[in-house]
Swiss-Prot record:
GO BP field: translation
Role of this protein: With S4 and S12 plays an important role in translational accuracy. Located at the back of the 30S subunit body where it stabilizes the conformation of the head with respect to the body.
Name of a matching Pfam family: Ribosomal_S5_C
Cystine pairs: none
Domain S5 DRBM: 12-75
HAMAP family found in the cross-reference section: Ribosomal_uS5_B (MF_01307_B)
A GO molecular function held by the record: rRNA binding
One Gene Ontology cellular component: small ribosomal subunit
Encoding gene, per UniProt annotation: rpsE
Subunit-structure text: Part of the 30S ribosomal subunit. Contacts proteins S4 and S8.
Name of the protein: Small ribosomal subunit protein uS5
Length: 167
């Protein structure tokens, strides 16, 4: 449910995934506040998410965007898709993603779609299992994307050439 997208001067795409009103009950009544979940990416393999809380919606969104910019990770992409199928989990949410052919598009729902789009993934097949809580789905998706290894990374780790491991 990506509701809003902006492009900053430093070419970061920002998406607002969810805004939630929460309340704290005190002796005098309820204190309302808001939470915002956002993702930020450069469209070329860098992505981060942020979760902000404040008494007003704009302040919560601004805090979430700042946290997202500070918590960016780099993922290995293969011409707009993934190098290999990958699974991720966080809490009760599980996600599965696999590379797709050119022209397939982003087959993903809700929060996972927002993360993949700002990360620069253009062709992917994905499925979310278990809890569909947006925060857990975003964390599981980013965990899975961080686990993607390029052939160059695998070759370097094994001390072989790329040609040797691709056989």
């Amino acid at each position: 449910m990506a509701k809003e997208q902006q492009v900053q001067a430093n070419d970061l795409q920002e998406k607002l995934i969810a805004v939630n009103r929460v309340s704290k009950t005190v002796k005098g009544g309820r204190i309302m506040s808001f939470t915002a979940l956002t993702v930020v990416g450069d469209g070329n393999g860098r992505v981060g998410f942020g979760y902000g809380k404040a008494r007003e919606v704009p302040a919560a969104i601004q805090k979430a965007m700042e946290k997202a910019r500070r918590n960016m990770v780099t993922i290995a992409l293969n011409e707009g898709t993934l190098h290999h199928p990958v699974k991720g989990r966080h809490s009760g949410s599980k996600v599965y993603m696999q590379p797709a052919a050119e022209g397939t598009g982003v087959i993903a729902g809700g929060a996972m779609r927002a993360v993949l789009e700002v990360a620069g993934v253009h062709n992917v097949l994905s499925k979310a299992y278990g809890s569909t809580n947006p925060i857990n789905i975003v964390r599981a998706t980013i965990d899975a994307l961080v686990d993607v290894k390029s052939p160059e990374m695998v070759a370097a780790k094994r001390g072989l050439t790329v040609e040797a491991i691709s056989e």
